[in-house]
Amino acid sequence: MDVLKSLPVTDNHIHVDDKHGYGAEKVAKTFYNAGGKVMIVLNKPTFDGNLTASMDILVRDVEIINKNTPVKAFGLVGVHPAELTYLMKFMSLEEAKQRIVDALNYAKKLVEEYDFIVGIGEVGRPHYPVSEDVWKASNEILKYCMELAKDIGCAIQIHAESSTEEQFKEFSEMAKEVGLNPEKVVKHHCGNMVLEGERYGIFPSILASRVNEDVVKKSLRFVMETDYIDDLKRPGVALGIKTVPRVTRRLIEKGVLDEEGVYKIHKENIERIYDMDLEL
């Protein structure tokens, strides 16, 4: 019997794309057949000027997964930070910033309207070099996202440059300034940042390929992700959809993780971040 059959397995950062990839239903079924149980799905950046259409598509995709597959899916909606520099090709920084703020207000409405939309993300700041003005505006947008999350009592997933202790400290202080519990702040695409997460309250979402014995021995206060992209023209650009179940299974078989540890990472931490009760 598969060791994962009765265990929760959650991928905390997935993109699905009916237009360019396999689409929501096929991706979810592949994930489930590999041993996955819960998907946290986020809308992709579109770079076409329409910042809300992808959020509506995300709502539809999560509904499709929950209706047509055994997987439990939840969504986060937001504006990817790279959209700012894209919009600036056609308008001023201030105009682009206002367009993003308007879209984030729409994201807030979706979180309030749908029980399965559980947070705002991915939002943050560019992971590539930008001007001081763009960096400042990106941080202002990120702080506004935190204010929205505080107002509606939800989590936020941050896309930013590579994680450091100083960054975790900065995000923690930013959250506290607006009254948001840092535990509701998830840093996407992390490496081994579990101790820094404990120190500053930020929740690290660690790439499954980087979850190993060293990480698990330090702390189980993290979640796992692939950042799966679902684009047939870009195979291998991110981890495959089967990776979180595969890595979890391997850690169990090696004796690194026991059942209690699996429940901690894949169920309890997810419930804690997103204020949900996973009935699996």
Swiss-Prot record:
Matches recorded under InterPro entries: Metal_Hydrolase (IPR032466), TatD-like (IPR001130), UCP004961 (IPR011589)
Top-level division of the source organism's lineage: Archaea
GO molecular function: hydrolase activity, acting on ester bonds
Record-linked Gene3D superfamilies: Metal-dependent hydrolases
A Pfam family matched in the record: TatD_DNase
Family the UniProt entry places it in: Belongs to the metallo-dependent hydrolases superfamily.
Protein's name according to its UniProt entry: Uncharacterized protein MJ1127
